[in-house]
C-alpha cells in the first residue's frame, strides 16, 4: 500500500498523506534511509567494481563535511557506476572522520558527512564500506595499556597490543556503531595483519609463557625460540580477528568484514577467520608485478576477492609522489586482476575536509568502462591448472622476521620470469594444492629452504606418479638431494655474481650458488662457470615423472633487473619437463597468458605488459603488440572462436588437435574465447 501511495499521488487523501509522511519520517529517523524505497545493494561476493577513498584524518581536520554534498556523491555514481564505494572513517593516526560517539573524532565537522554518503548510496543501490585502521592506531597507542611494547621496553607509536583493551573498548564498539547507527554495508580494515608486531607487554609475555611453557623471551632474530615467539603472535592476531568479527556480527549479522591483506600473499595461509571477502592494494611503484603475484594467489583462496589499484604512483622510500596515473595505465593494471577472475577497485585520496577531487572521476569512468566490458566474461572465472608456483606457508614464516611481512621477492622474480615466457602460472600454498597435485603438469618450488616433511613426501610421490617438479636455488635443491641424484659440494656461496654457461655465457647477480656432483642417471643442464664443470641445473627421471633443480638462485636478480638470458634458461628447463601446455603464444615476450574457464568457455587471456612499468611509475601510453599466434590444444574442433570484448571473429584453423588463431594486435587486454557448443 505504501509503495502504491507514493507511486500514485492522485490516490493520496489528506489523511493518508499525513499517515505516509509520519511513516516515512519514522523510517528516516530509525535507519537514515527509507528502506522500502532502497534498491537492493550487491553483496561484496557479487560485486565487481568499486572506488576507495581515504585521507587518514588528523587533528588538522577542522571542517570535515563542509563540501561533502549529495551532488558530489551523485556525480561519482553517475560517471563511474560502481557496485560499491569505500570511504574513510578512521585512518592510521586514529582520528575518526565522522562524528563518532564512541571513538576519537577530528576537531571539527560541518554536519554529519557519513550520513550524507549513506543516504545517497542507499538511494542509488550502491554499497558503502568503511576504510578503518585496525591494529594501526597512533592515538590509541597513547592510552595506557593499549600500545604494543617494543623489545626495548618502549610503547610502539603505531601498533596496538593484541593483549590490551583496544579491541574491546574501541574497535568493536566503533564497528558496531558504523553497522547499527549508520547502516553501512561493511568494513575494509586497513593497517591490520601487516601492522601487527611482537609485543613485550606483561600481558603478552604472560600469555606466551602460559601457552608455550617457554620462559626465556627472545628479543632479536637468532635468539632461542625466536620462531616460536613469532608464531605465538601470529596466532594471537588470528584469534583477535575472529573475536572482533564475531562480536560485531552479534550486533549486525549482515555486516561484511574484510581485513586488508589477511590471507593473501602478505599472510599466505588457509583462511581461518569468517571474513566475507579478501582484499589488498597494489605496490604504487610496481603495480603490474604486485598484481601479478597477489591475484594468482587469491584466486585459489576460496573467498570472494578483489585488489585495489592506486590512482597515483609514489615511492615508499622517499614518499615522492609521481602524480596521477593515466587511464591506460590503470586499465592494464585492472586487466591483470580481471583476467584472473577478481574484482577491482581504485584508490583516490579525499581532501582534508573529506570531500573528493571531482576532476579525477572522468579518468575513473574510463577505467570503469574498460572493466565493465570484461565483467560478464571474466568475473569469477577459474584457472585451468598448468604450472603451480609454490608460496610455502611454513617456508615463508620461517624466512621472515616480522609477523606478516611480504618478503616474497625471490618467488615473485621466478613468477615474472615464467609469465614473461608466456607460461600460464598459478601461485599456490600447500593448503590450496595438497591432494590435487596431479592436476598440475609442472610444480615449481622457488627458493624455499624449508618445507614440511609431509608436503615434501607429497611432492616426491607426485613425481613418482608422473608429475614434474622444478626446484629453484641450491637451498631448495638440498631438500631433495637423493631424488635429484646430486651430491652438493661445500657450502652455499653467499649472494653475488654467478656466471652460467649454456649455449653462451651470462651472469646472474644477487645469486647464491653451490657446486654439485651428479649420479649417472641425472643429466646436467648448463654449468657454473669456474667450478670445474659442475652443473648449473640438472634433470632426472624419477618413477614416471621428472625432477629438476637449479644450483643457483635467480629470483632476486630477475625481479630487479630482468634479462632474456635468465628468463630463457628457466623457461628452457621448464619446457624440458612441461612439454605439452594447453596454450602457446608466439610473437612477443611482452604478453601475459592466463588460461581460465568460465561458464563452460575456455578463456585465453592476453595482457600487453610492454614498456618499463617496473622502473617508470607513470605510463603515459601503451604501445600495442602483435601479431600474436595463439595455439590451443583441444581434442575436438571448436564450434566458435572469438576475440572479446572486441567481438571480432578471427580466422582459425584446426588440425592435429590444435586450434591456431592469429591476434592481429593487442592493445591492452583481449581474450581468445573458445566455445564447443
What is the meaning of each model-derived region?
Residues 130-182, 191, 216-230, 241:
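Active-site-adjacent "subsite" loops/lids of carbohydrate-active enzymes
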Residues 295-362, 384-403, 536-564:
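Aromatic/acidic polysaccharide-binding cleft in carbohydrate-active enzymes
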Residues 53-68, 96-111, 154-172, 222-239, ...:
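The substrate-binding groove and active-site-proximal loops of carbohydrate-active enzymes
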Residues 334, 362-439:
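Aromatic-Pro/Gly-enriched surface loop or interdomain linker
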Residues 78-113, 136-156, 182, 198-204, ...:
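Aromatic-lined carbohydrate-binding/catalytic grooves of carbohydrate-active enzymes
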Residues 32-91, 100-102, 106-108, 119, ...:
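Mature N-terminal, pre-catalytic/accessory segment of carbohydrate-active enzymes
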Residues 140, 195-198, 237-295, 316-325, ...:
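Substrate-binding cleft/loops of secretory-pathway carbohydrate-active enzymes
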Residues 254, 289, 323-330, 338-340, ...:
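A conserved amphipathic helix/loop scaffold
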Amino acid at each position: 500500500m505504501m509503495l502504491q501511495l507514493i507511486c500514485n499521488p492522485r490516490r493520496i487523501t489528506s489523511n493518508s498523506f499525513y499517515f505516509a509522511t509520519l511513516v516515512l519520517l519514522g523510517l528516516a529517523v530509525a535507519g537514515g534511509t527509507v528502506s522500502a524505497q532502497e534498491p537492493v545493494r550487491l553483496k561484496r561476493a557479487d560485486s565487481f567494481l568499486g572506488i576507495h577513498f581515504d585521507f587518514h584524518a588528523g587533528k588538522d581536520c577542522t571542517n570535515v563535511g563542509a563540501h561533502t554534498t549529495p551532488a558530489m556523491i551523485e556525480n561519482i555514481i553517475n560517471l563511474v557506476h560502481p557496485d560499491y564505494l569505500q570511504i574513510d572513517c578512521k585512518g592510521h593516526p586514529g582520528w575518526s572522520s565522522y562524528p563518532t560517539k564512541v571513538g576519537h573524532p577530528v576537531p571539527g565537522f560541518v554536519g554529519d558527512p557519513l550520513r550524507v554518503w549513506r543516504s545517497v548510496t542507499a538511494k542509488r543501490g550502491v554499497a558503502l564500506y568503511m576504510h578503518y585502521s585496525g591494529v594501526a592506531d597512533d592515538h590509541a597507542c597513547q592510552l595506557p595499556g593499549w600500545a604494543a611494547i617494543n623489545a626495548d621496553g618502549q610503547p610502539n607509536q603505531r601498533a596496538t597490543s593484541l593483549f590490551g583493551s583496544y579491541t574491546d573498548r574501541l574497535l568493536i564498539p566503533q564497528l558496531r556503531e558504523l553497522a547499527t547507527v549508520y547502516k553501512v554495508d561493511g568494513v575494509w580494515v586497513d593497517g591490520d595483519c601487516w601492522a601487527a608486531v611482537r609485543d613485550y607487554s606483561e600481558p603478552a609475555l604472560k600469555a606466551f609463557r602460559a601457552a608455550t611453557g617457554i620462559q626465556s623471551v627472545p628479543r632479536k632474530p637468532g635468539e632461542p625460540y625466536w620462531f616460536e615467539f613469532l608464531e605465538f603472535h601470529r596466532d594471537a592476531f588470528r584469534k583477535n580477528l575472529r573475536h572482533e568479527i564475531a562480536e560485531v556480527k552479534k550486533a549486525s549479522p549482515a555486516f561484511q568484514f574484510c581485513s586488508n591483506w589477511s590471507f593473501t600473499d602478505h599472510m599466505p595461509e588457509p583462511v581461518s577467520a569468517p571474513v566475507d571477502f579478501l582484499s589488498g592494494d597494489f605496490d604504487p611503484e610496481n603495480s603490474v608485478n604486485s598484481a601479478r603475484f597477489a591475484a594468482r594467489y587469491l584466486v585459489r583462496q576460496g573467498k570472494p576477492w578483489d585488489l585495489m589499484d592506486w590512482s597515483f604512483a609514489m615511492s615508499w622510500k622517499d614518499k615522492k609522489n609521481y602524480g596521477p596515473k593515466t587511464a591506460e595505465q590503470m586499465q592494464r593494471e585492472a586487466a591483470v586482476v580481471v583476467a584472473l577472475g577478481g574484482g577491482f577497485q581504485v584508490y583516490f585520496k579525499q581532501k582534508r575536509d573529506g570531500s573528493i577531487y571531482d576532476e579525477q572521476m572522468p579518468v575513473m569512468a574510463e577505467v570503469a568502462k574498460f572493466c565493465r566490458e570484461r565483467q560478464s566474461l571474466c568475473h569469477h572465472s577459474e584457472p585451468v591448472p598448468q604450472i603451480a608456483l609454490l608460496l610455502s606457508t611454513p617456508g615463508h614464516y620461517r624466512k621472515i622476521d616480522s609477523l606478516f611481512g611480504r618478503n616474497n621477492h625471490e618467488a615473485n622474480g621466478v613468477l615474472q620470469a615464467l609469465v614473461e615466457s608466456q607460461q600460464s602460472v598459478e601461485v599456490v600454498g600447500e593448503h590450496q594444492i595438497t591432494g590435487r597435485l596431479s592436476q598440475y603438469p609442472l610444480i615449481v618450488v622457488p627458493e624455499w629452504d624449508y618445507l614440511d616433511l609431509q608436503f615434501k613426501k607429497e611432492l616426491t610421490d607426485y613425481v613418482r606418479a608422473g608429475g614434474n617438479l622444478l626446484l629453484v636455488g641450491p637451498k631448495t635443491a638440498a631438500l631433495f638431494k637423493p631424488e635429484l641424484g646430486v651430491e652438493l659440494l661445500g657450502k652455499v656461496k653467499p649472494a653475488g655474481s654467478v656466471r652460467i654457461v649454456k649455449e653462451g655465457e651470462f651472469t646472474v647477480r644477487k645469486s647464491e650458488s653451490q657446486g654439485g656432483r651428479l649420479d649417472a642417471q641425472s643429466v646436467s643442464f648448463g654449468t657454473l662457470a669456474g667450478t670445474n664443470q659442475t652443473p648449473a641445473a640438472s634433470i632426472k627421471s624419477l618413477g614416471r615423472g621428472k625432477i629438476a633443480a637449479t644450483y643457483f638462485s635467480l629470483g632476486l636478480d630477475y625481479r630487479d633487473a630482468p634479462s632474456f638470458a635468465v628468463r630463457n634458461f628457466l623457461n628452457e628447463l621448464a619446457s624440458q619437463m612441461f612439454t605439452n601446455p594447453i596454450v602457446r603464444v608466439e610473437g612477443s615476450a611482452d604478453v601475459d597468458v592466463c588460461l581460465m574457464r568460465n561458464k563452460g568457455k575456455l578463456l585465453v587471456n592476453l595482457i600487453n605488459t610492454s614498456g618499463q612499468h617496473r622502473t617508470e611509475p607513470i605510463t603515459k601510453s601503451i604501445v600495442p603488440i602483435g601479431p600474436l599466434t595463439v595455439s590451443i590444444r583441444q581434442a575436438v574442433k571448436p564450434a566458435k572462436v572469438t576475440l572479446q570484448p572486441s567481438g571480432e571473429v578471427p580466422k582459425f584453423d584446426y588440425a592435429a588437435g590444435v586450434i591456431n588463431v592469429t591476434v592481429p594486435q593487442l592493445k591492452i587486454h583481449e581474450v581468445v574465447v573458445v566455445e564447443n557448443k
